[in-house]
Structures are given as C-alpha cells and as structure tokens.
C-alpha cells in the first residue's frame, strides 16, 4: 500500500492502496540513480526478510506436530497472508517507489490495488481473529476447550478473507471517481468519499476498536487471576504463621506409570510423637491429622490427596517450616507480579506495533481525500508512512511466533535440517 505515489498530485487512495500527492507536494518526478540504488537495497531487504520470516512460520507449523493446534492455525494463516503481501504486493510497490511512476499499465494497476487492499485488510483482520481466540480462551477456559476446534478457526479465517473481498472489490465494480484513471503514470485507488470512509473503517478503525476492547478485557482477566493467586498465597502464608500447615495442593509429575496407579504415603508415623514433615500434614476440621498420598495416574500426572490418619492430633509446624513457607509465599508473590508485568509488556508490544505501523497511514487515508486542495503531504513522509504499514507484515511473525519457545525450537530444527533427516 503506497500512501503517496511518487512525484504525483495530492490525490489519495483508500487503504491499503496507493496515494498520490498533489501540486503542493514537495518532491521530484525524475529520481536520481543513487536514490534508486539505496531505495532498492532497503526495500529489497525488507521484502526478503518478510518472505523469509513468514515462510519459516508456515514451515514450522507444517513440520512440527506440537505446533499443530487451533491457536497456531490462526498464526499460520496470518503468516500465509503476510507472505502473500510480501510476494504479490511488495515487489510491485517497491518498483513503483524506485521508478517514481507506474509503468505496468492500467490492468496491472487494478490487479495490484485489489491484491493490496485484500491482503493487507485480511492481515489486519487476522490480528482481530487471534485476539478474539485469546479472549475466549482466557475468559471461558473450561467451555472453550471443546469449542476451540479447527472448524472454528477455519470460520474465523474465512471471515477475514470475506471482509477483505468486500472492501477490495467495489472500486473494480465502479465505486470510483473519473479522476482515478486520468494519469497513466499513477496507480491510485478510488478517491470517492463514501468508499474512503467505508474502506478505512472496515479495514482499520473498527478492527482497532475491537482489538483494544478484547486485549483490554484479556489484561483485566489475567490481572484478576494473577492477583487472586497472590492473595491466596498471602492467605496461605498467614495461616502457616498462625500454626497451621497449608492444605496440600495438586501438583504435576512426570514419573507416572502408564496403565497403572501407584500409591505412596507422603508422611509416615513416628513413634512417641505427632506428625510433622515438610508441611505434608495439617490439622483437619475434626481434629484428625491428614496424611498426603501421591497418586500416579495414567498420563504422567501426580495428585496429592489428603486422607485421615490414625495418629492423634498434630502439633504445630516447627519454626523452620514457618520460615520456609513465608519464603515460598514471598517468592510466589514476586513471580505473580512478574507475570502481570510480562502480560502488560506482551499486550503493549502487540497493540503498540499494530498502532505504530498502521495508524499514520489510515489517518492520512481518511483525511487526505477530503482536503485535496489544501492538504500538503511531503513525498518522503508519504513514503515512510506507506512502508511503515507494509513493515507490519515483517513484524507479525516476530511478535506472534518468534517470541514463542515452541516456535523457537521448531526454527532450530529447521536450521539444523533435523526435519530433513527424519
């Protein structure tokens, strides 16, 4: 999507397609050789990195079984969409930028604009689909496990492409102005005011509002759970300080034996005294001591279950046990707060990158068609805004995949050709 067509008039395009600059624009129609070389190197590097990054994400999901789940299907579809932007749209946009004029003819121009709008809009809407999937997963985790199916992912993906088609096709069906094709050296999308509002709101402003609402609620839900964990830990620590050991909690183990159950007593009776061993015993409501047993279940999981003990009442935990639990409670509290900070950072990166890349373009896309005679857009600024939007297709795989440890392991396998050996 070109925000400003090189060296042209102050006519705009709707997102995400080329703009033209008007007579008030500062720029040159005849570019220098050094400009062409430098621009070619910069844009060529951006395109190469975008193709490589998105192709690696697609390959990782296709080759690594552990990555083949509904959440990653959406990320994989996003990578395919950004790969289409990188292969089908960016080369023509780069040529347009380097030559400072459109040289591929009107038919190719129409195809370029349609692909530009379709792929960039679908890419943005994929980010909404991922946000919606994450919102359902964190706010309704129990029920959504059964609803989170490949069919639902396919429906979300299909919806993103359908909306993209509904936004990209109208100019080809006549929703444009007579001036849109008046200059053979320029390639611009419809400057019709109605289409400008329709396309900018459908492709960006409504998705932006939806993402802000969804990620805002995701953050609130995550913060609520984290702080609930902190309060629970602090309450457990307070109970321990007053003489009662905390109730045993379920924990996982990888030592389970398939097809059988192993029962092991976590506390053993000692003659001549009460039971007190690393917090595995607590005073029951009926005064009886509770022993902890470990249950090894099929599926490599271990659970701790309290059972009444035949021993008598248990004395309070020793001071060393209290200090240990206080330290554990403080450590868990710090971990919970660190998780909250990480959540803020992650959501900030996701929304910050999206807004930084696309907001400048869509502000220009919405405003410029309504002030053609009075608005002034420097050519260089227009090019920066334009390619800032395109760069989102390069950054998406970094944000949604490369920060994920499972994807990192798959990428290492790809680099070391482990999949080839298999």
UniProtKB/Swiss-Prot annotation:
Glycans are attached at residues 10-11, 24. CDD domains: 7tmA_5-HT1A_vertebrates (cd15330). GO terms for biological process: adenylate cyclase-activating adrenergic receptor signaling pathway; adenylate cyclase-inhibiting serotonin receptor signaling pathway; behavioral fear response; exploration behavior; positive regulation of MAPK cascade; regulation of behavior; regulation of dopamine metabolic process; regulation of hormone secretion. One of its GO terms (molecular function) is Gi/o-coupled serotonin receptor activity. Disulfide bonds join 109-187. Coiled coil: none annotated. Residues 1-23, 235-263 are annotated as: Disordered. SUPFAM superfamilies: Family A G protein-coupled receptor-like. The keyword Membrane applies. A motif (NPxxY motif) lies at residues 396-400. A motif (DRY motif) lies at residues 133-135. Serotonin binds at residues 116, 120. Residues 60-73, 133-152, 217-346, 404-422 are cytoplasmic. The keyword Disulfide bond applies. Heterodimer; heterodimerizes with GPER1. Interacts with YIF1B. Interacts with GPR39 and GALR1. G-protein coupled receptor for 5-hydroxytryptamine (serotonin). Also functions as a receptor for various drugs and psychoactive substances. Ligand binding causes a conformation change that triggers signaling via guanine nucleotide-binding proteins (G proteins) and modulates the activity of downstream effectors, such as adenylate cyclase. This is 5-hydroxytryptamine receptor 1A. It comes from Pongo pygmaeus. The gene is HTR1A.
